[in-house]
A protein has these predicted regions:
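Short acidic/histidine-centered micro-motifs embedded in hydrophobic/aromatic stretches
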Residues: 1, 38-39
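Amphipathic alpha-helical segment used for protein-protein interaction
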Residues: 5-37, 44
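Helix-turn-helix DNA-binding module
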Residues: 34, 42-62
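DNA-recognition helix of helix-turn-helix
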Residues: 53-77
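Short, basic, alpha-helical segments at the C-terminal edge of helix-turn-helix-like DNA-binding modules
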Residues: 76-85
Length: 85
């Protein structure tokens, strides 16, 4: 997911699915959402994100890893729910 957006290889449909998954993540776990926003969209490193959020780098790395996996699962579930065009 992360690589695709930065390379411009993500489809419009996937961007919509990602946006919906991010909204769900924000409601579910705001800290993970913030880690994703800083790492992915702001381009901060683990260390920079940790400093910005007053967390340890290990915590940020764990939250980042979990959030990416969760987002991919959510997007896949949403993709399966969509009717075929």
């Amino acid at each position: 997911v992360v690589h695709d957006v930065h390379t411009g290889e993500m489809s419009g449909e996937d961007l919509i699915l990602l946006d919906g998954a991010l909204e769900t993540l924000k409601a579910r776990d705001e800290r993970q959402h913030d880690v994703v926003m800083l790492r992915y969209f702001a381009g901060l490193t683990i260390e920079q994100t940790a400093a910005a959020m007053d967390l340890s780098p290990a915590t940020v790395k764990n939250e980042w890893t979990y959030a990416r996996a969760w987002l991919m699962r959510e997007m896949e579930k949403a993709r399966k729910r969509e009717p075929d065009a």
